[in-house]
Every structure is written in structure tokens, then in C-alpha cells.
Amino acid sequence: CITPVTDDKKVTFAVDDKNGYAKTYSYELWSISGDSLIENGDLTSDTEENGYRIFDIDIRMDIKPDTEYMLIFKLDGADGQTVRYYTRIVVNDNYHASELLDFVEQFNASTFDYEANEEGSFIYPYMQAYKGQDDDSLSMGHLNLTSSYKELVWSGVNPVRITSIIPQIKEIDVNYAVIELDYVTTAENTDGESDYYSIREYYRVSYKEPETEDDTETATGAEDAEA
């Protein structure tokens, strides 16, 4: 995944370590090719939010905007093992990552609004961009905006989401972003038993500035979305 970073060059990590496994925390910043260490340092946390320890990395070195780097968050465990989390980072204040993530989460939430009228739904305007195109979705296991509205709202299966959504930005630049959502749902089958489904959705979205002060929808709209 990739983590957009604003010009303040601060990256924040939230760590769930209720068992106290980690003894020390540190980070490394590398060139994307992995052949040049740009900086590293130790990390401490004095902040906790919702049970997560918060670590802020303030990148000291000058890094080029719109250039990808590899950031490694490391923790050394009590058993002598080192755990590493890798992410790409890129600096740009104009990617509108927060707005795009908000849009994707709203689109996803709308697929669980089983009572909404199709034409009044949040999804409907984005389906119209694909109106008249052949439906190339394979089944309920693979849907996109050429699918019917009924399919996009789960065709009467009425699942319940039982995990938090985990969003990941896979790609991002000033033109568009690819965002992945992962979560688990459950639904009752015809035998009255519970089935469980691991869901992965992909969205290709782009940001548009609002045309008027009252036009709030296009401010977080997308030209294309796929799930």
C-alpha cells in the first residue's frame, strides 16, 4: 500500500500491543529501490487512543514531492524477533486522500442501505456513467458499476458486516487513487445457518473541485468506482 504524506512530513502509526510484546520501536526510511538508507531513528509513544499506542514519525531529511520512498516501522519483541511493517510514502498536499477515503466509505455504506430507492441512492449517479454498457460482472462474487442496482445492494442476501473496514490506498497521484476495502460479513442461508463472506472491494476514484459553493457532492465525488 501507499501512504500519502502532507508537506509537514509526519507519519502516524497506531499499534495494538495490549500484550506488551514489543520492547522497542524504530523506523527506517529508504529509497524506493532499497539501495539507499535516507534516515532512521528510535520511537517512543506517550499517547494512547482507543487502546492503540500512537507513534509519530517526523521525517527530518528533505524528500522530494511526488516521489515514492519506502518506510519501515519496526518493533523488537521480547522473544528477540523483529517485526517489520512496510509502506510506501509520497509527499503531496493535493492528493485529497481524506476526501477520497470518505467517499469510498460512504459508497460502501450505501450498498448496505437495503431500503433506499435506487434513483435516490448515493450509488445511482455513479451507475449512470456506465449506463448502456454491457454488464461484465461474473456473479455476486464479482461486481462493478455495470452491475444492476439490486446486485450492488446484495440481491436480498442482506448481510451484516461483522468486522471493521480496513481501507488501503494501493495507488495515488493527482489524477486518481485506487483504494481497497477488506471486511467480513455474515448472512443467514436457506437452512437458517450463518454463512461468512470475506469481502474485498476495489475503487478507482478521482477528486473534483466543487463547481459552486453549494455543490458539496462533487467535492468528494468520483469519476469511476469499481467494487
At which residue positions do the language-model features occur?
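Beta-strand elements of well-folded, non-transmembrane domains
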Residues: D17, L75-G77, Y183-A187, Y207-E209
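Short beta-strand edge/turn micro-motifs at domain boundaries
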Residues: I32-L37, D42-T47, D62-E68, D76-A97, ...
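Aromatic sugar-binding surface patches on proteins
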Residues: D46-D58
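...the same signal can extend to comparable exposed beta-sheet modules
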Residues: D102-A109, N117-F122, D134-S139, E171, ...
